[in-house]
Amino acid sequence: MCIRDSIWNGTNPKFSWTIDGQEVGTELSYTYTPTETGIKKIVFTVTDTTDEPEMTLSKCITRTNETRATLEFTVECHSEEESHRRPASGASSATWDRVYEYTPAPGQFINELVSGGFTGTETSPEAAVAYAEERMKKNTWVSLGGWGGYIVVGFDHSIDNSSSGYKGGYNFSITGNAFKGSSEPGIVYVMQDTNGNTLPDDEWYELKGSEYGKEETVQDYAVTYYRPTYSGADVQWKDNQGVKGKIDYLKQYHDQPSYYPAWIGTDSYTLYGPCLKSRTYDQSGNGSYWVNGEYDWGYADNFGNDRLSEDDNAAAGAMKVYFKISNAVDKNGQPANLKYIDFIRVQTGVNAKAGWLGENSTEVFGFTDENINQGK
């Protein structure tokens, strides 16, 4: 298991990782390889040399009057990888079973009552999940908003990392609506239910795609979105590269009061993950015709070669992209070698906007176990 925090604005930070009181690492990230079962207490400490360090950690912190911040958590180690595997049976459904979380970034379809399908009553995380479930049960798209927005789903069984998957080992698919010139790539993650509690609270593994490891891909990216102070306003954001921007309010197309998710109670929230280099450009040169270019493979809602279809999807209908569990990697980029998965997460992978078309936002219609479905 690889653990890594995000530090913003530290001048000269020094890091310390301890397990049960013993220091085991001094870098920003630490790879923990358990040697026994049981619960371990892990403490991460950041010490900065300035009088007033400014830093943000990706989890709750305890801050002293000194230049120090600590993060403390526990890890429960289990023995057999197969111990919580849920084999598929004749009664298993090939499609997703449940939405566990729906946390989009702000976007033109968020809170939108017409094409977005919101009712105006989605004011809690539970209501947002119910909205996403209802949409996908009808094979209708759910928008993840701008960069970093995500959805988490599970199945009524474990999906095997099987070489007998569809067309040479594709184990599952995610349905989007990409077509030539309109790709809004979503980065895909998978998880095993390692602790057996049927919840997606174990370790996520990214499925590497064609852009993984490239210099222009920012692997440790983060964006903070800020709630607008009045109706009809743009949503301001700031990333961990020092860049500021906004999700444009497009009144002529989507005039709901706010594009900031109504069920997020805080005045700002931060999303984390990789960011792909945008391939959005103005082909017309005058702002009238924008293109969202595709990526080779490995992303949801993308017109790549893993569509396994010659259909150009000119009508922007529902279209599958196929994925292999064998492409899962850990935080260090090493193969995860998962035998099966239980949960899937998709996250909008680019921070870009296309003029009057608005922000790039991944859309998903559904998730399918292709070991069972075989491309049907």
State the predicted function of each range.
Residues T74-E184, K208-K376:
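A domain-level signal for the mature, folded cores of soluble proteins
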Residues T47-T64:
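Short, solvent-exposed loop/turn segments at the edges of extracellular beta-sandwich modules
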Residues K167, T194-E203:
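Acidic, glycine-anchored loop motifs typical of Ca2+
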Residues N12, T37-K41, L338-F343:
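Extracellular Ig-like/FN3 beta-sandwich strand-entry sites
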Residues M1-D5:
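Conserved small/polar residues in nucleotide/adenosyl-binding loops
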Residues S16-T33:
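Surface-exposed, flexible coil segments in extracellular/virion-facing regions
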